[in-house]
A protein has these predicted regions:
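Acidic, His- and aromatic-enriched active-site or binding-groove loops in soluble protein domains
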Residues: 173-188
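Interaction-surface and assembly-scaffold signal
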Residues: 71-122
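Post-HEXXH active-site segment of zinc metalloproteases
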Residues: 206-224
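Auxiliary, metal-adjacent structural segments of Zn-dependent hydrolase domains
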Residues: 116-173
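Short, flexible loop/turn elements at secondary-structure junctions
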Residues: 161-163, 182-186, 201
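Long, well-structured alpha-helical subdomains associated
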Residues: 218-276
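Active-site recognition of the HExxH zinc-binding catalytic motif
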Residues: 190-210
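N-terminal mature-domain "stem" immediately C-terminal to a signal peptide or N-terminal signal-anchor/transmembrane
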Residues: 1-78, 238, 252-267, 271
């Protein structure tokens, strides 16, 4: 399967730096990366916290459907200057977004860079002995679901030391980029593998909604519900021994909510897709 898909696993300190700063902004939606325990721990270890202006944080929350691109460009850029140029050229963010959010946000990123990079390099060294097992676990998981991951010619997984909550996926001409938490133990390895499956399901099921998917109109919730149920059907068919673990990971209450929210014919369609 690996030969067919082309799996590449990397570590990207600039993306981790950006997500370190994002982890300090409460968002209150499905893309929220805020983690109070992480914020406290990193303040103790670095002796500082990002100085994000509250007005910039408010702009991020209020205009998230436009400025969310800020969480994806770091995967394919190597620094702030390149990232800002990519954001300006994207056509998604206007000058007001740049002035009120992107520029003050990236000033905070640059102020954190030296302290964070020193911490990151130390973390890389500390986790060196766990990397082979973590990477092998992802490769084996992809082989297990070979028919599913065969939808992708190339997958690049960035394992992150900063990501605390929700994974990310970004499609570009170079293939699929996934941003996943580096697993600290076996339970974390299961979480990372299931997050990989979750993120890779979105491009298959999201088009079935037939419109732009946004946070502010509820369509993102429906997109998530589709993924919840598709993956449940897929795991039941391909790896039934993981089914209860998956249900606990998603949350059984969320699976029930998905079944209530989606029409029976849509649920049947998702089951049929997962069985192809």
């Amino acid at each position: 399967m690996e030969e067919k898909t082309g799996l590449n696993i990397i570590y990207q300190r600039y993306a981790d730096l950006v997500y370190h700063v994002l982890a300090h902004i409460p968002l209150d939606n499905a893309a929220d990366e805020y983690d109070a325990e992480y914020v406290r721990t990193m303040r103790e270890q670095l002796g500082r916290s990002p100085a994000i202006p509250e007005k910039a944080a408010e702009w991020y929350r209020e205009h998230f459907d436009r400025v969310c691109l800020i969480g994806f460009m770091p995967f394919v850029t190597g620094g702030t200057e390149e990232c800002l140029a990519a954001l300006r050229g994207s056509g998604m963010m206007d000058e007001a977004d740049m002035e009120h959010f992107a520029l003050p946000f990236f000033r905070a990123v640059e102020e954190e860079k030296d302290a964070y990079y020193a911490w990151w390099e130390k973390k890389q060294a500390e986790t060196e002995d766990r990397k082979p097992g973590a990477e092998a676990g992802l490769r084996e998981f992809i082989r297990r679901f070979d028919g599913f991951f065969g939808h992708y010619d190339r997958i690049t997984v960035i394992l992150s030391h900063s990501l605390q909550r929700n994974g990310r996926m970004f499609m570009n001409p170079g293939g699929a980029f996934l941003y996943l938490k580096f697993p600290g133990n076996e339970a974390g390895m299961e979480d990372t593998r299931l997050q990989l499956l979750h993120e890779c399901t979105h491009p298959l099921t999201d088009p079935k909604l037939g419109n732009d998917i946004r946070m502010d109109d509820g369509s993102h919730d429906l997109a998530e519900y589709q993924v919840f149920l598709y993956d449940e059907f897929l795991i039941e068919r391909k790896a039934p021994e993981l089914l209860e673990r998956y249900r606990d990971w998603i949350g059984r209450e969320w699976l029930e909510e998905a079944r209530r929210a989606l029409a029976p014919e849509r649920t049947a369609m998702l089951k049929e897709m997962a069985c192809e």
